[in-house]
């Protein structure tokens, strides 16, 4: 650690490798995020691929919670929340995607370290909405011509995760990783000691004797018992069909080469979002599965 700091690195990883036979990615997520805390920024990345010889689970699963920093952008207005320094800054940015890049350029991370898995080990996690393209195509797609946002969702929401848990399903190991920002401390020794304490705290949450219980749930699906088909939507079936015809005409005319049409269906539910994800990962596994929770 001290050698890396002396070499000029300002973002340093501390890690502990443990057995993973007592823990699953789903349980690890629940250890880090309480069931009733549905606004805690966090994520779970998994992968399952269907092959001719059967189902193959991806080698790595990654869990993260409590980001050190968050960036939220909406129509050029950017909010940067540094939870480590306890600061909040609001600014105008013609291209908000430059903000996380500018922040990262302030640091020199140690990205090569023996023992770190060849997987995502920490960094920015979040989402970019379709309207993010308006920051690039400012003339053709200005925000002034954007459709009404009845959800009031941000264009960009990113979290910088210094604490991550990486499951290696091949070697049956779990890497618990904490990244230390030297700019948050007065000395390297202080940074190292606090980093060790934070890593131990992360480990203790995974090893807690009060491990949260996961509901057994039910994989049996019977959509008929939930009533009639979804009726509440953003458009009628006929309007959607007309949109498909219009899209084909634009493609034939050479205006576009592809288009993504969407139709939102809604239904009131009291289901827990994470429990819905647990069901989806069983009934519809995919190579890129993610559960993302933001404020």
In which residue ranges do the predicted regions lie?
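Extended alpha-helical targeting/anchoring segments
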Residues: 1-295
């Amino acid at each position: 650690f001290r050698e890396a700091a002396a070499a000029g690195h300002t973002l340093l990883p501390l890690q502990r490798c443990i057995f993973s036979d007592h823990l699953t990615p789903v349980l690890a997520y629940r250890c880090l995020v309480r069931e009733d805390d549905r606004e805690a920024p966090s994520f779970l990345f998994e992968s399952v691929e269907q092959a001719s010889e059967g189902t193959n689970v991806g080698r790595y699963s990654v869990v993260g919670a409590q980001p050190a920093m968050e960036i939220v952008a909406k129509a050029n207005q950017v909010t940067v929340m540094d939870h480590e320094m306890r600061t909040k800054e609001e600014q105008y940015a013609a291209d908000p995607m430059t903000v996380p890049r500018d922040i990262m350029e302030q640091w020199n991370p140690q990205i090569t370290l023996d023992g770190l898995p060849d997987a995502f080990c920490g960094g920015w996690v979040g989402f970019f909405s379709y309207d993010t393209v308006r920051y690039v195509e400012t003339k053709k797609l200005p925000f002034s011509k954007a459709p009404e946002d009845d959800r009031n969702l941000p264009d960009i929401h990113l979290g910088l995760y210094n604490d991550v848990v990486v499951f290696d399903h091949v070697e049956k190991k779990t890497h618990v990783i904490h990244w230390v920002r030297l700019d948050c401390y007065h000395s390297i020794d202080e940074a190292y000691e606090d980093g060790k304490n934070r890593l131990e705290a992360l480990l203790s949450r995974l090893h807690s004797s009060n491990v949260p219980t996961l509901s057994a749930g039910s994989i049996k699906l019977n959509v008929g018992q939930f009533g009639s088909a979804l009726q509440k939507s953003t458009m009628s079936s006929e309007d959607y069909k007309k949109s498909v015809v219009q899209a084909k005409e634009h493609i034939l005319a050479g205006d576009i080469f592809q288009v993504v049409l969407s139709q939102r269906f809604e239904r009131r539910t009291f289901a827990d979002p994470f429990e819905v994800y647990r069901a989806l990962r069983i009934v519809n596994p995919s190579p890129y599965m993610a559960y993302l929770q933001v404020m």
